[in-house]
Regions:
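Short regulatory helix/loop adjacent to the ATP-binding pocket of P-loop NTPases
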Residues: 107-123, 135-140
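A short beta-strand-to-loop transition that corresponds to the Sensor-1 phosphate-sensing loop
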Residues: 102-107, 112, 127-129, 387-391
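Conserved catalytic/switch belt of AAA+ P-loop NTPases
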Residues: 83-107, 114-116
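Conserved P-loop NTPase "ATPase switch" module shared by AAA+ and STAND
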Residues: 66-82
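A cross-kingdom feature that marks ATP-driven nucleic-acid transaction machinery
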Residues: 1-47, 69, 248-249, 254-256, ...
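Interdomain hinge/linker elements that couple catalytic modules in large macromolecular machines
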Residues: 136-313, 319, 323-325
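Short glycine-rich substrate-engagement loop in P-loop NTPases that contacts/grips substrate
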Residues: 42-70
């Protein structure tokens, strides 16, 4: 079953603006769909083919004579020597849309690309399926303004808690959301093994797979939480500097998203540590051994998984439109926290996330953000709300809403 990806429209726009297009993202999130998009008029080559890779590495000029644009080059990181020749080609005779490149992770390739193809390349990041893609809803950045939310109500069916936790546990990988009967445990077992055996050895120079696996499981237990490197290191039996470096590896691989604190000169008492979110809740559930959705929903980490899912849905709503997600969070030294702060067009939009159908008094803590409305760098305090399991979109006050999770 083919599920249309929201990023396809963004690809079409960038293709008309840049000579080179790079698609990055974690393994198995659906980058092969671009092979389908390219099938009509674009040659496809993969650097997994040793003969093609050998030609690209030893005779890059000859490679470009053999494979003319428009061209899709898969796993470009395996042939880094080709990048300077791509630059020369597009400078001398390139046209917009000449080359599409795909890469399973960002890592060191991004440094090489930024140096070799600066100003010539459009970069997009593909993650797993969004809720909007699964229900075939139009794409668009999630900004909780009144008009947007009222339109979303018409586009989105109600999502009961049990159905949402089915989706959270299942995860966002296309292979697990297609018509094929893919075994969940077998899929994620293979996924983790591939990551450890190929990516970790190649990109983190880690030879002890078991040690990194312990770290990966420990990191999963922090999803939806502020990171404490010392505690994470103790749990994984490594040093704190190593834990910090390995978490950066997971972020570069696209397995986790580090949500930085929202900063403003008028907010002087906020914590500075990031929060960590696994980009695929199914992978986090597998690593933490939640064996089914019902147990996860009733478990101690259910709220953390709900927050992870909600943050990543909002993140994807921006990234799938080719925008850098304007997300942060704010927590003061009195442990008052706004789970998500969207900074859009001079306004901040505070959001709380609760596993409840009728959370109360959650918007009062939004007042800790009021100092940003004063001074030279003042921002407006825009519409916000509480993402929850309310049966309908309901106003809390003149500015805030109870937002059913299915609207994300």
């Amino acid at each position: 079953m083919y599920i249309k990806r929201h990023l396809e429209t963004t690809i079409e726009k960038l293709n008309s603006c840049f000579k080179v297009l790079l698609v990055t993202g974690p393994r198995q999130v659906g980058k092969t769909l671009f092979r389908g998009l390219a099938a009509v008029d674009r040659t496809y080559v993969t650097m997994d083919d040793i003969s093609v890779r050998s030609l690209a590495m030893t005779e890059p000029a000859l490679f470009l004579q053999r494979y003319k644009p428009p061209l899709l080059i898969d796993e470009i990181q395996l042939a880094p020597k080709l990048l300077p020749y791509l630059k020369m080609y597009v400078d001398e005779q390139g046209q917009n849309g000449d080359f599409w490149l795909t890469r399973s992770q960002a890592f060191e390739l991004m440094h090489g690309v930024s140096e070799s193809l600066a100003g010539r390349i459009g970069i997009v990041n593909l993650l797993g399926l969004s809720h909007g893609e699964l229900i075939d809803r139009p794409a668009g950045p999630f900004v909780p303004e009144n008009e947007f939310l009222l339109r979303r109500v018409e586009e989105s069916p109600l999502l009961p808690m049990s159905d949402l936790f089915d989706q959270i546990w299942q995860g966002s990988m296309p292979a697990l959301n297609s018509a094929s009967e893919q075994d969940w445990n077998c899929y994620y077992s293979s996924y983790v093994q591939t990551f450890l055996q190929r990516d970790v050895k190649e990109l983190a120079q880690v030879n002890d797979e078991l040690q990194f696996y312990r770290f990966l499981c420990a990191a999963a237990s922090y999803t939806g939480s502020m990171i404490n490197y010392a505690a994470l290191a103790k749990e994984a039996e490594i040093t704190a500097p190593t834990a910090k470096q390995w978490l950066k590896v997971l972020a570069a691989a696209g397995l986790v998203y580090l949500l930085e604190p929202f900063m403003h000169p008028n907010l002087k008492y906020g914590v500075k540590a990031p929060k960590v979110y696994f980009t695929d809740t199914g992978l986090a559930a597998y690593l933490l051994r939640w064996s089914n959705a019902e147990i996860l929903e009733a478990g101690a980490m259910s709220s953390s998984f709900l927050e992870t899912w909600a943050v990543m849905e909002i993140y994807k709503s921006f990234s799938n439109c080719g925008q850098i997600p304007p997300l942060g969070y704010y927590r003061d030294f009195n442990s008052r926290e706004v789970e998500l702060v969207l900074n859009v067009d001079g306004s901040i939009h505070p959001l709380a996330i609760r596993k409840s159908s009728s959370p109360v008094k959650e918007t009062k803590k939004f007042d800790i953000l009021r100092p940003v409305t004063e001074g030279e760098r003042a921002l407006k305090l825009g519409a916000g709300g509480v993402i929850c399991f309310a049966n309908d979109l309901l106003p809390i006050d003149a500015r805030n809403w109870y937002i059913p999770a299915g609207l994300l």
